[in-house]
């Protein structure tokens, strides 16, 4: 039997989130997710797949240039960026044979990749100043068959210089449509054409003449945009939300349509929805599908950040977005607009400024004081954010953050120490909250909310804090006229409440709070977005007689040389949820579930500042009472001895002649648990 399509599965790595990690690939798995791309040619499938990974790549060609000092060396070493090194080598004039010699990758693959490069060169030869050149229709068709996106074609033709990216994409799109170059929808036929295909597994391709599916045009379908590749920060939580939305859509009598390309998800199972498009979540591809489907509406709020980012662009093309409007989503996502809105309704937030010069940064820091949170503008999701606690750290970090300029401002925010982080997950209808869940982080604010241990219902919040959070959430929901799911993160210190951010979509804690509360918040939200009247649940978070804990799973043991200190950048790769009769019981279950072992006899304490030593004292006394033998380093050892806690002093490698050495004891596995609080809390490039 012959199959008429080719499938490409590509891993997603997030090694950039770990400081000092070894990027070479080997026998230990380092990827955190994967994508699956389907096309009629290898070239089409691999280019689709490289876009799907979602790391800012547009395909095999037309990406931002990688800076590589030694191409030969880079080709020899297998890293997560290897395919883009091959692209750069081809661009630099390497032949297939040369690359084969250095990489030992089969020539068949390299020849196919070279075909893409040849087409790219042909497109470059038509480069014009600012307007769409008359390129041969055959060349345009060939590029599309090889999986080039409209953006890649626009960039190869030099349209980016004269117009913004959005205009360039639309110019190519309109030209392509006028030339009759349109994708067709093909059905995955697992029966090799021996019987009629049964599945509703669909993909789009330019190598075909007719659609395999009949479109009724009855506007009875609802399209749900999926969550894409699993990665650090967006994983199965958003898939759960998407699946709950699909189930609700089906129950309410609509045709459910899913667009997603992650083979690990439940939403890409063939029987989960009426139609599954196993294809890209890019603006171009989503528009191709929507023009064919002509749906009643599109849901962008259950798939995490990827669909959320498409809302404004889809709205500009008159796509009916269900639930909260695209303008409201933009008002919450855009820092300036959101900040202005909070000021208007009298809600407090940590002070922040987007600054364009070192003098401005120093003036602002003099006003709010250290520590401050610094975020260079050209990065996403906590990547390259840093907490700086003095002027020296700030200057060192800004050197790493590339140039501070008008084009690349740096956002500096006041960082509030010893504040609790509290999350509000809720569903609203026309600006009125109908169901909510307030959960508290066990760690102080400053650890990314995806790495924090979360407790729900909250056990240690003042009643007044909860009351204020509910009031502020109501005001924000009304102001943004929210219909659907949303999440607001708060800082609470005493009863002083500040808003960190607001996301007008389901958050990663929705599945956890839905399960603990036993109310399916996404089902409620989907009904709201479909315009179906819903009852307010009569359940309150204070009615629960148990506690839920969500704890994070880390994979540092697979990542050689990575620094395991947590900070504002998310590093966990999974999570567990446990329920217990009280906090201690639930936390113990959660810690055992993520693989921590209860220490048996020896514990090493090494605490940094005097305040930390005082904070640690009662715990040290308790451990001693339980029969643990305590080891401690320098200052900690003296402090414990002065306060009547018996301990054995151990030494750091900086005093090699003294015994016992802490590291030797760790190597010999004589210590069961280490509590190590460093003096300075800062990420790797600036840590001594």
What kind of region is each of these model predictions?
Residues 232-253, 614-630:
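Glycine- and acidic-residue-enriched helix-capping/strand-helix junction motifs
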Residues 99, 153-154, 682:
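Short alpha-helical "recognition helix" segments of helix-turn-helix
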Residues 324-385, 641-651:
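A conserved helix-loop-beta module that forms one wall/lid of the active-site cleft
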Residues 270-275, 279, 639-666:
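Active-site rim loops that border cofactor/substrate pockets in soluble metabolic enzymes
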Residues 678-688:
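Residue-level detector of conserved catalytic or cofactor/ligand-binding positions
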Residues 1-126, 132-139, 143-147, 166-168, ...:
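ATP-dependent carboxylate activation and anion-phosphoryl transfer catalytic cores
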Residues 274, 284-348, 363, 683:
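Conserved N-proximal alpha/beta basic substrate-recognition cap immediately N-terminal to
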